[in-house]
From Swiss-Prot:
Protein name per UniProt: NADH-quinone oxidoreductase subunit N
Quaternary structure and partners: NDH-1 is composed of 13 different subunits. Subunits NuoA, H, J, K, L, M, N constitute the membrane sector of the complex.
Gene name for this UniProt entry: nuoN
Family to which this protein belongs: Belongs to the complex I subunit 2 family.
InterPro entries for this protein: NADH-Q_OxRdtase_suN/2 (IPR010096), ND/Mrp_TM (IPR001750)
GO MF, any single term: quinone binding
Organism: Escherichia coli O1:K1 / APEC
Compartments where found: Cell inner membrane
Phylogenetic placement of the source organism: Bacteria, Pseudomonadati, Pseudomonadota, Gammaproteobacteria, Enterobacterales
Length: 485
């Protein structure tokens, strides 16, 4: 197989991020300079984002048997790069007061971003597995980065052990699928899984084990038990990456698998996925009700958001609108999560003890940081799916897709889940405007809006509001990103 210049252009984001990893590694070996390495990482990620324009000019193509570059891959690559950029930006002020080595943080984020880009382009079960491992392994280190705090170390050990178990399920499932179908590429799976083949016990067992592995990575019920503890224990910038880049990349590749290989045609698999979606929506929202820790609350709410997305995935066979729904929903979820975790990051720093993640830390925030409180309010309203925010557009799409596919049970679950979610999101929003305590526990720097992290948070809030009122540009971009079969 020969690699042409066109192929290299198609792989530009992957190559640029890979090169940035090497440059940052050499820079760390040469001289430890926090500002320099953070800047190099941000420049590399920005260059990868810009390179997507050239990728678009090259058109859709299968670069290798393992990777397909098309509009779909470009959309998800862009979202992963945006989430990685935000993570690096939030991490800089957070790491300023960190006493141990700061620079490796950026290295690990870049390697995880590389895994996310590989997943966005994956067209084969081998690249799917490689991408998932490449995004998971750096996260073991990132989750435990504040290892002097007991919670962070505990979260890292928990995530490492459970993630390894989930990967073994995923790999065993792939082996069973290969034993039955004789191929691992998504397109060949689609051709080989002809009439009646999907009911073969070996194939059902294989896909069942793969659902266990992928369900863990996406923190779907009942494979979600690690989520709240890891979100709480991980440093705030890492929780940002876990909630956004990791979930978006893995959901993107699952979607492509379902698109090419008609896994959803099997009644048994559809029923299992419907039960998982129903349980994730209801359980995630109910568990979030009692939380007084914002990071745990966002952890449980992410379980319910993935449940909503699963509704659109189950409806994938009924038409293209469900792909549009997933794209719009994920963009809304990305910016809302970046804003919410960004506010937590701005309020936190390792030399002031654990992150500012208790609800009490935000009580009365409006009276001394009004703009920051307004941003947090917008993010909570968007996550709750209130009209005039981008979260509402995404949720409306999911409901429309559910109705179109006659998934009445799941539509009911989405409505009930959204009603429950409204309570705990508004509880966070209301606490920002209560009477401030005499001694405010935690506070953001007075010039937070001029810092890079503050600018990212403000842009996220602006996009959530503007695209919530006028979503047409986003819908057009998502439509362009439909994969060509």
């Amino acid at each position: 197989m020969t690699i042409t210049p066109q192929n290299l252009i198609a792989l530009l984001p992957l190559l640029i991020v890979g090169l940035t990893v090497v440059v940052v590694m050499l820079s760390i070996a040469w001289r430890r300079n926090h500002f320099l390495n953070a800047t190099l990482s941000v420049i590399g990620l920005n260059a990868a984002l810009v390179s997507l324009w050239f990728v678009g000019q090259a058109g859709a193509m299968d670069v290798t048997p393992l990777m397909r570059v098309d509009g779909f891959a470009m959309l998800y690559t862009g979202l992963v790069l945006l989430a990685s950029l935000a993570t690096c930006t939030f991490a800089y002020p957070w790491l300023e007061g960190y006493n141990d080595n700061k620079d490796e943080f950026y290295l690990l984020v870049l390697i995880a971003a590389l895994g996310g880009i590989l997943l966005a382009n994956a067209n084969h079960l081998a690249s799917l597995f490689l991408g998932i491992e490449l995004i998971s392994l750096p996260l073991f280190g990132l989750v435990g980065y504040a290892f002097r705090q007991k919670r962070s170390l505990e979260a890292s050990i928990k995530y490492t052990i459970l993630s390894a178990a989930a990967s073994s399920f995923l790999l065993f499932g792939m082996a069973l699928v290969y034993a039955q179908s004789g191929d691992l590429s998504f397109v060949a799976l689609g051709k080989n899984l002809g009439d009646g083949m999907l009911n073969e016990p070996l194939l059902l067992a294989g896909f069942g084990l793969m659902i266990v592995g992928l369900g863990f990575k996406l923190s779907l019920v009942p494979f979600h038990l690690w989520t709240p503890d890891v979100y709480q224990g991980a440093p705030a910038p890492v929780s940002t990456f876990l909630a956004t880049a990791s979930k978006i990349a893995i959901f993107g590749v699952v979607m492509r698998l379902f698109l090419y290989a008609p896994v959803g045609d099997s009644e048994a698999i559809r029923v299992v996925l419907a039960i998982i979606a129903f349980a994730s929506i209801i359980f995630g929202n109910l568990m979030a009700l009692s939380q007084t820790n914002i990071k745990r609350l966002l952890g449980y709410s992410s379980i319910s958001h993935l449940g909503y997305l699963l509704v659109a995935l189950i409806a994938l066979q009924t038409g293209e609108m469900s792909m549009e729904a997933v794209g719009v929903y994920l963009v809304g979820y990305l910016f809302s999560s970046l804003g919410a975790f960004g506010v937590v990051s701005l309020m936190s720093s390792p030399y002031r003890g654990p992150d500012a993640d208790s609800l009490f830390s935000y009580r009365g925030l409006f009276w001394h940081r009004p703009i920051l409180a307004a941003v947090m309010t917008v993010m909570m309203l968007s996550l709750a799916g209130i009209p005039m925010t981008l979260g509402f557009i995404g949720k409306f799409y999911v409901l429309a897709v559910g109705v179109q596919a006659h998934l009445w049970w799941l539509v009911g679950a989405v409505v009930v889940g959204s009603a429950i979610g409204l309570y705990y999101y508004l509880r966070v929003a209301v606490s920002l405007y209560l009477h401030a305590p005499e001694q405010p526990g935690r506070d953001a720097p007075s010039n937070w809006q001029y810092s890079a992290g503050g600018i990212v948070v403000l842009i996220s809030a602006l996009l959530v509001l503007v695209l919530g009122v006028w979503p047409q540009p986003l819908i057009s971009i998502v439509r362009l990103a439909m994969p060509l079969m």
